[in-house]
Regions:
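Preference for the N-terminal adenyl/adenosyl cofactor-binding alpha/beta module
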Residues: 1-233
Length: 234
């Protein structure tokens, strides 16, 4: 809280959306500067992979699924005298997480072998914690539909070359081709409650619950799956 100044209310979704776009541009410039031979599509894919991993870790930290990871990693790197870049330390952490989660998110990707320039990774990590003195992100308190809405809108933009190296432009065709559309919360609630609750009503034990399988073949940001988990938990 700042004394003597009136705090302005800001939209969490709008602020996060803006910050994610900033992160995307920073990573693109930081990786493109030392990897000029990369094709634009592969570069965009690599940037998205890194950002996906960092967002996952921020959510996992705040929801206490993972211990604080990113800031401690920066502090360790700052104290280290090995000459290793923060980006390389981050890649090592990704390899550890791949052993734990065994998912496509942390599986090896060419981006891990690229050179990073100008402290891009450090800048992006700090942005994902918020702006000191103004706001902080708490992903534990942030509703899943807010994060999902922001993320699906964010995916509807593409990277384009500019004098600064990279800018984001809205790509209507990409949204249409890839089916990137946000499903309103009330629709998610209605469909999940009507499809899943009758099944849950017939469960009489934990063993019955373990037999349930929930499939969303076009999950996007996972709104339906997150709601399904909430309903099962309740």
């Amino acid at each position: 809280e700042r004394v003597g100044k009136k705090l302005q209310k800001i939209s969490v979704g709008a602020t996060l959306y803006k910050d994610l776009n900033t992160c995307r541009e920073i990573l693109t410039r930081g990786l493109a500067a030392f990897n000029k031979e990369l094709d634009k599509d592969l570069l965009a894919e690599g940037v998205q992979k890194i950002l996906d991993r960092l967002i996952f870790l921020r959510v996992a930290e705040d929801r206490e699924i993972e211990p604080p990871t990113l800031i401690p990693l920066i502090r360790e790197w700052e104290k280290s005298k090995t000459g290793e870049h923060l980006y390389q330390s981050m890649v090592k952490k990704f390899r550890e997480l791949d052993e734990i989660y065994n998912s496509n998110l942390f599986s090896p990707h060419p981006v891990e072998n690229w050179e990073e320039y100008s402290g891009a990774t450090e800048k992006v990590v700090k942005i994902l914690y918020g702006k000191p003195g103004y706001y902080e992100y708490d992903f534990k308190a942030m509703p899943a539909d807010v994060l999902g809405n922001v993320y699906e809108n964010y995916l509807g933009y593409k990277l384009a070359e500019s004098q600064k190296g990279a800018t984001l432009t809205k790509d209507v065709r990409k949204r249409k081709e890839q089916g990137i559309y946000y499903t309103p919360t009330f629709i998610v609630d209605y469909i999940v409650n009507n499809a899943l609750k009758p099944v849950l009503d017939n469960c009489r034990s934990v063993a019955d619950l373990k037999k349930i399988k929930v499939l969303d073949p076009a999950c996007g940001s996972g709104s339906f799956l997150i709601k399904a988990l909430e309903v099962i938990y309740e």
